[in-house]
């Protein structure tokens, strides 16, 4: 009927070995999952703390659905705000040590809504070269001038700040934890430079919320920078285990986004089950602190094992550990063979990462046992030798 040129591109992907099928899980998201009837060790989810199937969250979601229904039937600004939506935002602001918080339908929608609403033609956005795709797309939607600085290059960032001093507002945007490499942004130095040149900072804590800081408060709290970062955005779907995105900010910024943030304005609000599960997740993170201990113990054990085997895992200092292969087809071979050995670890290639930087990105969680990780390392050893990667 149309778009026939897409068939050619898809066929080229198949010939290059980079075409991927969606993989359907047949079980809940745990340390082990079922795919095609086979139990696999899960190393590809963002379920850092194991909250996605935590019984407390599941029960709270079920109870909320029974009491308040399956959906809300409206956007927040018309008839879709329940008291629980407002209560959760108050709790989230308290958790993040900010004046206010606003919840969006997803982390991606948060970045689109925040950046497109807050920046105009008189402003400049200064963004790290390896920021998440949602930041890139959010910047594209603004009318602001833009400057991309080299990845975590403070000298290049300072040059960008020096070159843009005539702007009304300058916003420095960085991931807190970079999702493909697992490295942490040098946030103290970024904040110092921003303050030196009278600029603001926005941190995307998608992979830091629930991982860094006290009880998972994120990168800002991790570095003791509470009160010095204008915008903290993040997801509620990774370590927090449910769905949604948020911005933690000052009250007047929240008020403005309620009126001008298009993804917020034109999307139906979260169902009661989602809201209440998110609220319960914050309580679990405050109360079950042993989850963080297990997460970091597992992280160090697995990283050490991969290094000992001789894999290139980059400079990650977080639970994200990339096994960098380079060649896209070889990366997917590694992923496929790992599955044959009982490990679910997906290959990631262009356009998610740059060409020639393909990798199998692994993420350990608080749910993994030592047996899980030892078995996974043995699989990496066998497959790595088969493919002559080690």
From Swiss-Prot:
Question: Could you say which enzyme class this protein belongs to?
Answer: transferase
EC number(s) reported in the record? 2.3.1.47
* Record field: catalytic activity: 6-carboxyhexanoyl-[ACP] + L-alanine + H(+) = (8S)-8-amino-7-oxononanoate + holo-[ACP] + CO2
The protein's matches in SUPFAM superfamilies, at most eight in alphabetical order, are given as: PLP-dependent transferases
Sorted keywords for this record are: Acyltransferase, Biotin biosynthesis, Pyridoxal phosphate, Transferase
The residues the record assigns to binding substrate are 20, 132, 352
Q: Which cysteines are joined by disulfide bonds?
A: none
Mark the residues carrying the PTM N6-(pyridoxal phosphate)lysine.
Answer: 238
So where does pyridoxal 5'-phosphate get bound? 107-108, 179, 204-207, 235-238
KW Transcription (keyword) present = no
> Pfam families from the entry?
Aminotran_1_2 (PF00155)
**Which GO MF terms does the UniProt record name?**
8-amino-7-oxononanoate synthase activity; glycine C-acetyltransferase activity; pyridoxal phosphate binding
Q: Which InterPro entries match?
A: Aminotrans_II_pyridoxalP_BS, Aminotransferase_I/II_large, AON_synthase_class-II, AONS_Archaea/Firmicutes, AONS_Archaea/Proteobacteria, PyrdxlP-dep_Trfase, PyrdxlP-dep_Trfase_major, PyrdxlP-dep_Trfase_small
Needed cofactors: pyridoxal 5'-phosphate
NCBIfam families documented for this protein: bioF, gly_Cac_T_rel, PRK06939.1
Q: Which family does it belong to?
A: Belongs to the class-II pyridoxal-phosphate-dependent aminotransferase family. BioF subfamily.
What is known about its subunit structure?
Homodimer.
Listed name of the protein: 8-amino-7-oxononanoate synthase
Q: Which organism is it from?
A: Exiguobacterium sibiricum (strain DSM 17290 / CCUG 55495 / CIP 109462 / JCM 13490 / 255-15)
